[in-house]
Amino acid sequence: MKGKLTAALLCAAFASSAAVIDGSYRIVVPKKRPLGVQNALEQAGKELASALKEGAGLDVEVVWSSDFKGAMRKSPVIFLGAGAAEKAGVMPADLKGFENMIVEKGGNLYLFGRDVQRFPKEKNPPWKKCVLPTVKAITRFMEKFLDVRFLGPGEVGKDIPKTTKVEVPDGCRDRHLPPIDYAPATGYSMLYGYAANAFGPGAYHSYGGHTYHKACPQEKYFKEHPEYFGLVNGRRTPVPLKNSTLCISNPKIEDLLLEELVARLDEGAAGVQLGQQDGRQWCQCAACKAYGGAAADTVGEKLWILHRRVAERVAKLRPGKIVNIISYSETATPPKTFREFPENVMIEVCHPTEARLKNWTENYKVPHGFVVYIYLWGNYPMPGLTAKRSYMRCAEMVRMFRRYGVHGIYRCGFGELFGTEGPAYYLFGRLIDEPEADVNAVVQEYCDRAYGPAAEPMREFHDTLDRRLMASDLMENPDSEFGSASPQNPLDLLAYIYTPEVAAKMDACLVRAEGLAETQKQKTRLALVRGEFDYARNLGKVAALYASYRFSPTELTFAPLADALEEREKILDAIYGGNDNPVGLPPKFPGWPEIALFGNNERRILVSNGRLRATIGSPLRWNVKMMRARGMLPGMSRESLEVPRTERVPSFGDFEGGEWAKCGWQTLNGIMSEKPMVEARFKLLAGSDCFYVAAESAMGKAPRIAGAGRDGPCGGEECFVMTVSPKDSSENYFRFMWNVDSKSRWDGRQGHITDPLDPKFGSIDSSWDGDWTVQSEFKNGLWRSMVALPYVTIGEQAPGKGVAWGFNVGRIADCAAKNSYRIFLLWNPNFESPRGITDPSSRGLIRFP
């Protein structure tokens, strides 16, 4: 704040006369720069010229410095970049990083900082790979002297009021040092990013949190060096398949991490991120268990020791460069075996809380201080892809960061809802520069500038929503000794936020605002709010009606719920332009191309409300059309079929003829009855000695057959899953899994250990190895397999007439799309868990005639 006041006073001191910008000015863009910087400054110069045109009606030409010659030099100029400032003698020798200046001298204006490209040899990097203090100076100039406000990305995101005069005080020297130098966030547009302090990693190289897969990619090393990868359940495991496990005690892993970091530093980065992968499985080899000594009794402590060693080696090889070590997941707890870090280390604290930052700053020596990685937004926190953060939470977070000297903020998942969360985004960015700014005044400014004559009803709209979000933020209370009071189910939270009363009030406000908007920009912003609100309001309705159905699952309660779900399907169709492809992306928002609706998430993610904690299975993934056609009440009925008998052993290969002709195919749907994304089906036969299963499924390409062996992690690969319960019980059943490799299979049984003192009592016994066979082949895009299960293996005789068993078949598939993900199919659906393919309570019934 002191820097901003100083700059303002310096300008005010010369306010008796001023440089008045008119049509004779030109904007001069430096030509001799790295291409990334050059392109960014050209774009910024054009946007500045456009703002002068829209706000003041001025036609200001943008020219390259190489073309600025002859008669042009007699006209006044707005110079961009450090070169012209140095020639004019207005560049301070100590200006560095994102520090920038606005200077008036002799009628000319200089907007500048020392712009650099993070990787100088990269031919044409995007703006986020550059340090562009000149762009920050341009946004500040537009805010200060044109009264522009950056409310969102792109032209629609700018509010540019009309003015009759643009003037800068003579001798103005406005110097500004942003409080952060590390600001990764979704890069919607450059000027918005700089205005909102979401300008990218700057001079630091960020992997987005995870380094290991870059240092030791499985496609490069696993075949020749499986010893680099974690030993899990007796098997070396490649990185992407099983939660990115590496053998950290192997000295080569430390070397590979070092090589990766040094390579990025040698490319030009001032600092580089070091962080482990996601995942909860770690190498179980004896050397890893002993790594770090007896005091290193957790995986996190071992990782801290490894990461410190890597940083020490970097310090020797590349003095002056920085290693940014992430404190995340296993390393969320600071190290206990040491308190001081090498001279080249800064720490990136994930999930920063008051208690965590206080502990770090008071008890540890970290020479380059702290940056934070925040999870305020994204598709994974509750309540999902609807508005999440209150004004209160934004203000508390930013002010806390300032108290603890945090100099960087990684905004994970930021920017998916520029309509309903617009004021919160604006507030967060503004408070970074001015943490003590009045929150109500900033929110009011947003509403005034975004909605014009519709500001009053829209302030009421946003405040009504904010009061619900504030209560949710207060319930979360991460530092409370009693833990969070927030609902653990996103449906419960959605039902609380969008009650009928709240939703009706918000809608009434929005209707009033839509009738008051005047300009096209205002109408476009309101259209975005409308789309996001209609989506959220429908979710609130679904949540309330689903609660009613669960209390009383009848046709009367199912009908309105089904109506709301069909309404939701229409909303999704509108968002995705009629594209029902699960991996389809939404088109750009009409009239606002910089907006990626709902964070540009694939349809499958929005269908489930988001990822991780935000995921909702039932009822959002129900196939309502199918349910209505079959008169089905979800959770109140089970799939069932009769199993034909045979005296002959059926053949493997021809599932249409021979004995298999006696039975029809049973189709697997999505795990919650939704339309399947992969085709899979099965048949059953009851022989005199064995129970037979024929299963086949489409596979778009040849599967990767690593082979898990007997009782290996079959579920990590393409597989079928079968549950057999002769007693039709959730406590007594057998489970079988098999892969494309017929030797790769798993089995276990539940309920057969009756001693309560046995460690395996109450859980599935995977040490049981039953006698059963699998035949399997992959050919022409089709995986076909046959299982023969002797009755004696499951302690049964050939079932007599009228006998019924609990039974289910599932399929785990890998999507072949660019963003690969797992697909879960099931014969008898699981309406409670979108991943509960092995849930024994979700079983159908097979009858033996």
Feature roles, as predicted:
Residues 11, 17-99, 164-172:
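Acidic, contiguous N-terminal accessory segments
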Residues 43-47, 51-53, 95-308, 315-319, ...:
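Feature activates predominantly on carbohydrate-active enzymes
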Residues 221-317, 322-337, 355, 428, ...:
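Polysaccharide-binding and catalytic clefts of secreted carbohydrate-active enzymes
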Residues 248-255, 349, 355-456, 460, ...:
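Structured mid-domain segments that build the active-site/substrate or prosthetic-cofactor binding neighborhood
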Residues 431-637:
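Catalytic domains of carbohydrate-active enzymes that cleave complex glycans
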Residues 628-849:
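Structural preference for beta-rich elements and adjacent junctions enriched in aromatics
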